[in-house]
Every structure is written in C-alpha cells, then in structure tokens.
Amino acid sequence: GGPAGDFLSQGGASSEEIMAELEAARKDDNAKAVLIRINTPGGSTGATQEIVEEMDKIKNAGKPIVISMGDTCASAGYWIASKGDYIFASPATLTGSIGVYIDYTNVEGLAGKLGVTDEKIKSGAYKDMLSMYRPMVPEERAMLQGMVNDIYNQFVQSVAEGRHMDVAKVKTFADGRIMTGREAQNLGLVDAMGNYYDALDYAGGLVNMDGDVPVHTYDGGGSLRGFLNADMQHLGTWMGKGFADAVRSSAGTSSVSVR
C-alpha cells in the first residue's frame, strides 16, 4: 500500500522510503542544501514522478539539490537526476536511456505443440491485453503505442524542463541510447565531471559553507542504488535497464518497460 506501493524486491528501495528521506531533508531547518547520490538503472514511472515531486518541494523551499551519479544513472535514474540544480558524473558513468518500450512474450505456438490451451472469462475485450497465449490485435497495438507515446512525452518534457532545454533538442538523443558521463556532459545532460566529494564541496559552496561541510545522512533503509531490483511478478510500467536486458518478460509475466 501507500504511494506507488512497494515496487521492489531483493533489497531495493521503495518510493515511500526515498520520499520519506527527501521530506525529512526538506523539513530539517539545519539542512541548507540536499545532495542526492544516484546509482541505479531505473525504476517505475509512477514512483519516479512521486520522487520528482518531493524534489520540487525541496527546491521550492529554497534548498538547492546537487546530484552525484554513481556507476549507473540511467532511465528513471536520469529522470530523477535531471531535476537537480547541478549534476556531477564520472566520465565513464552510464546514463541516458531516455525512451520507452513494451516487451511481451507470445508462446501461443509452443503452447499448441504442448497441447496447452488458455481459457479466460473476462469483463471486456482488452482485459487480457498482452496475453502470452494469443497474438496482439491491431487495436491493442494502437492503444499500447499511445501509452508509450504519452509516457515518452512526459519523460522528455520533464528532462527538458529540468535541464532548461527545448523539447526538440532533447528528442534528438531521447531514443533509448546509453551514453557515458562525458558524452552526457557534451549534450548538456550533465554539468560537470566529478565524484561524490566534488558534489559535496559544490553543495557546500552553494550555501556559503567553506572547508569541511557538515553532513547529515537521511537513510530510511534503502537507497537509489537499489531503485530497480525487481523480479517482475506483475504487469507494471517500468523505467530502465533495458540496455542490459534486465527488464524482460518471463514465463507467466509481461512487462511494460520505459527506457
């Protein structure tokens, strides 16, 4: 239950945990800036937007947000990062992956050879959309393409707003490609090359803190490091790690993935 549900398994952080940490930072009068370390290939669309909303609240409270990318900050990870005021990455960080795809498995032929039939009682013509036991009909394909286009446009618009770019410019590289941190900087998706401590120093400078910056860590038991570590036990709209084929359909499941 709760916002977006516990959409992860095997040690990943839920959106509830991440939002709670962001809320705590926003309400802490001693917190003058927020540094977010992101090391994730992605997560769910709805949860991503909930996290971004909390980030907007922090910025509206007058607290700057600095992003430090880890090994990977792709897809939903980049969606979140793009809302920061300043983004640091390492030259070899894997990022980008802005785009959307739907993947499902059709085993109708195999099931027929095995003598397996699928019977359903459903309330509407499209209730079993993405069934693995029948081909997709044109009307379903059109519906799903419309959904893909809508989510893609939301993703692109959010990145454009966060990075102060024209939507048309974002679309020139929002085709699902993975890029290095250096390539992302050349495209305007990253501000500077640097590690966590560089980002920490920069955040301190934004609030006129010289020397050692006092840090309080908000950690509700999860982190963006594990933002996507799911076994896809249900149909969902998912951001990310399509480049590593980590979000795939498996027997008995279908996935809608955004990357």
Regions found by a protein language model. Give the residues of each.
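N-terminal organellar transit peptides
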Residues: 1-74, 86-89, 102-259
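Short gly/pro/ser/thr-enriched loop/turn and capping motifs at secondary-structure boundaries
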Residues: 72-75, 94-98
